């Protein structure tokens, strides 16, 4: 089962004992705005990069073909 981007972010927040409010502050947005994005799993690539940086993580985006080839 694949996790959504929001689920992955929440897992990392939990692992780091960090709140959504703290992440919102670290990424320069309101807690409400980030909560809305998390509830809809609606992020731009820039959002994800900023969140990853605030969490001390790297982001890797790959495209996978049906034959298993990745780019």
Model-derived features: where do they sit?
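The alpha-helix within a helix-turn-helix
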Residues: 13, 24, 52
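A detector for short, charged/polar N-terminal pre-domain segments
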Residues: 1-3
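Short C-terminal boundary/hinge segments that cap the last helix of small helical domains
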Residues: 56-71
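Key DNA-contacting residues within the recognition helix of helix-turn-helix
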Residues: 10, 35-36, 49
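Recognition helix of helix-turn-helix/homeodomain-like DNA-binding domains
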Residues: 28-43
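Short alpha-helical DNA-recognition segment
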Residues: 17-32
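Short, basic-rich loop-to-helix N-cap that marks the start of a DNA-contacting helix
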Residues: 40-53
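Flexible coil/turn residues that form the inter-helical turn or adjacent wing/linker of helix-turn-helix
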Residues: 5, 16, 44
